[in-house]
């Protein structure tokens, strides 16, 4: 092994160490990391600078004099008085050049050590308590970005203190400003008797560098306690409309279903978070889960927002109600098991017209929609496919859509065979068209919560059981099920991992007459009654169940929406998705 000489520097030591690294089966990654680090050119340059500085410290050079500039001026004055020889004129010209004068000025500055900052003298009338406090001068360099800190007035001492540090902001990156620090001056302006909003305005107007005079907090907060919690927002939020937020400029707006990375939960009222996928590295303020729940509970109590039990529900997507039609499971001459008319045939008769409908009371109806903790999930080979749940507004024709997709690939897709109490017809087979059971057995299953949905049509009971869905999934098929939105809460379990797709019809305003020219204005006619019902149905689902929806498909025609649906289902086995954290634990 080569031996280093006593005069070898750190740079040569690192070079030799890099050449001596050998891969080890147990520490291959660590060895690779060290080799990459030691081979970096930037590290080599730093080592050379380090050696130069160490050499300088060992030599300890001292200046011959501390006023070279003054000496040069004296020499120039003598030469100007008697400038005869050419050498004297050349020396005078050389000493007069700006570059040499600048070098001499730098020499004097270094020799006199005038490069250290000089603090202003303390005022004569300063109190004794202030003299005992350690004052810290902090200079931050920032662009047009905010400082990344909020301030408040301490109720007991009246001092202006730092209330919070925004993760990723200028103050956080500096590591010099902490929660609890007392702010005394901003760019030489005292802030002892100014309001927090006046101080914020001074900070906002400061561009480039900003100098703060602060008194450090007695107990420094733990700045690096990252929570690394991912939350899906179940509501829309705009800090400009929130009067409770301590600083609107520090707020983080987000949309429903957007995933947020919560980086700090130190404040029980206001969390700090970032939008996942956002290029902005600075965190913003969002209401905490507890605070948002209290606000929603208060608004619900006072009637500001309606209670779920009192919602007026419009019609959802309805199946065909004819006894003989292509909805009976036949598609292009082939029969597909389970593709029968939905049990909601009876619901169509009962819900015709506008009437007050109570949303089923359950755990979901009492939940205050704030945040849902999520984690990344990717389907693994050999794992059961996720349940694909279709919900549709009026006019979506889900049964037709489901029928087309399953019939085109029955080996890959399947549907749950429903239960019924009606008598079996001569051409029907048990477990193919329906599971035929007695009314007593059907009602017993209802009592044991075995049905996802159930209803009555012409004095016969129809229903889709959870067991029927499990049977399809056990065959390694993608199970398609269409339900009313209220039933989604029964399916949101780790077993099913449902992917919810909302299908709504395309609604376009009709023109009275074709326009004469492209520039002519021809107002569209209002939506007819049927289109208004479709629009109201879609708006209701989006407003009250949008937090449960993963994808929205707009049905222009059957072929296009089928292609979109198949593409979405295909991506479920390839892409990574955010799901409730309870589904992956």
From Swiss-Prot:
Domain PDZ: 137-218
GO CC annotation terms, alphabetical: adherens junction; apical plasma membrane; cell-cell junction; plasma membrane
Protein's UniProt keywords contain Cell membrane: yes
Residues annotated as domain SH3: 226-296
Annotated Guanylate kinase-like domain residues: 385-570
Keywords (A to Z) from UniProt: Cell junction, Cell membrane, Membrane, Phosphoprotein, Repeat, SH3 domain
An example molecular function term from Gene Ontology annotations: PDZ domain binding
Annotated spans, Disordered: 510-530
Places the protein is found: Apical cell membrane; Cell membrane; Cell junction, Adherens junction
Pfam families associated with the record: Guanylate_kin (PF00625), L27 (PF02828), PDZ (PF00595), SH3_2 (PF07653)
Main subcellular localisation: membrane
Regions that span the bilayer: none
Domain named L27: residues: 6-60, 61-118
Chain positions with Phosphoserine modification: 307
Homology family: Belongs to the MAGUK family.
Purpose: Participates in cell spreading through the phosphoinositide-3-kinase (PI3K) pathway by connecting CADM1 to DLG1 and the regulatory subunit of phosphoinositide-3-kinase (PI3K). Stabilizes HTR2C at the plasma membrane and prevents its desensitization. May participates in the maintenance of adherens junctions.
Subunit structure: Interacts with HTR2C; this interaction stabilizes the receptor at the plasma membrane and prevents the desensitization of the HTR2C receptor-mediated calcium response. Interacts with HTR2A. Interacts with HTR4. Interacts (via PDZ domain) with CADM1 (via C-terminus)Interacts (via PDZ domain) with CADM1; this interaction connects CADM1 with DLG1. Interacts (via Guanylate kinase-like domain) with PALS1.
Protein known as: MAGUK p55 subfamily member 3
Originating gene: Mpp3
């Amino acid at each position: 092994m080569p031996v280093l000489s006593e005069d070898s520097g750190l740079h040569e030591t690192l070079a030799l160490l890099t050449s001596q690294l050998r891969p080890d089966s147990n520490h291959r990654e660590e060895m690779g990391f060290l080799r990459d680090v030691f081979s970096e050119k930037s590290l080599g340059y730093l080592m050379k600078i380090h050696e130069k500085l160490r050499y300088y410290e060992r030599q300890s050079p001292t200046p011959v004099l501390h006023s070279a500039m003054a000496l040069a001026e004296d020499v120039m004055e003598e030469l100007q008085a008697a400038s005869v020889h050419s050498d004297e004129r050349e020396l005078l010209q050389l000493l007069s050049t700006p570059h040499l004068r600048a070098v001499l000025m730098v020499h004097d500055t270094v020799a006199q050590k005038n490069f250290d900052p000089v603090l202003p003298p303390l005022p004569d009338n300063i109190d004794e308590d202030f003299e005992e406090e350690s004052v810290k001068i902090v200079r931050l360099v920032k662009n047009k970005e905010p400082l990344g800190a909020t301030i408040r007035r301490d109720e007991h001492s009246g001092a202006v203190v730092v209330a919070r540090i925004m993760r990723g902001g200028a103050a956080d990156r500096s590591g010099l400003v902490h929660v609890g620090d007392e702010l005394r001056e901003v760019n030489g302006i005292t802030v002892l008797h100014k309001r927090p909003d006046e101080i914020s305005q001074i900070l906002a107007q400061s561009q480039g560098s900003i100098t703060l005079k602060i008194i450090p907090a007695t107990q420094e907060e733990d700045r690096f306690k990252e929570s690394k919690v991912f939350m899906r927002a179940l509501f829309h939020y705009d800090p400009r409309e929130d009067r409770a937020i301590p600083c609107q400029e520090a707020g983080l707006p987000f949309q429903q279903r957007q995933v947020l990375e919560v980086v700090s939960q130190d404040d029980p009222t206001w969390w700090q978070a970032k939008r996942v996928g956002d290029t902005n590295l600075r965190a913003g303020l969002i209401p905490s889960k507890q605070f948002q729940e209290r606000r929603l509970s208060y608004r619900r109590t006072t009637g500001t927002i309606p209670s779920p039990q009192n919602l007026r529900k419009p019609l959802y997507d309805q199946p065909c109600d004819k006894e003989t039609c292509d909805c009976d499971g036949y598609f292009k001459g082939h029969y597909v098991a389970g593709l029968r008319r939905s049990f909601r045939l009876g619901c169509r008769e009962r819900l015709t017209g506008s009437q007050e409908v109570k949303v089923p009371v359950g755990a979901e109806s009492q939940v205050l929609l704030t945040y849902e903790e999520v984690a990344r999930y990717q389907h693994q080979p050999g794992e059961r496919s996720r349940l694909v749940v279709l919900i549709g507004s009026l006019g979506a024709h889900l049964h037709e859509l489901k029928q087309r997709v399953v019939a085109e690939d029955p080996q890959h897709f399947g549907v749950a065979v429903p239960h019924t109490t009606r008598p079996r017809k001569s051409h029907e087979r048990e477990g193919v068209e329906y599971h035929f059971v007695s009314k007593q057995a059907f009602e017993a299953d209802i009592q044991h919560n075995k049905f996802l949905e159930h209803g009555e049509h012409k004095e016969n009971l129809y229903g889709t059981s959870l067991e029927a869905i499990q049977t399809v999934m056990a065959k390694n098929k993608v199970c398609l099920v269409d339900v009313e939105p209220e039933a989604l809460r029964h399916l949101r379990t780790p077993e099913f991992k449902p992917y919810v797709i909302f299908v709504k019809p395309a609604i376009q305003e009709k023109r009275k007459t074709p326009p004469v020219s492209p520039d002519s204005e021809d107002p569209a006619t209002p939506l007819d009654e049927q289109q208004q019902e479709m629009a109201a149905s879609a708006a209701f689902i989006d407003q009250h169940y949008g937090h449960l929806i993963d994808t929205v498909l707009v049905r222009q025609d059957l072929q296009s929406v089928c292609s979109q649906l198949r593409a979405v289902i295909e991506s479920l086995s390839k892409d990574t998705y955010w799901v409730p954290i309870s589904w992956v634990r």
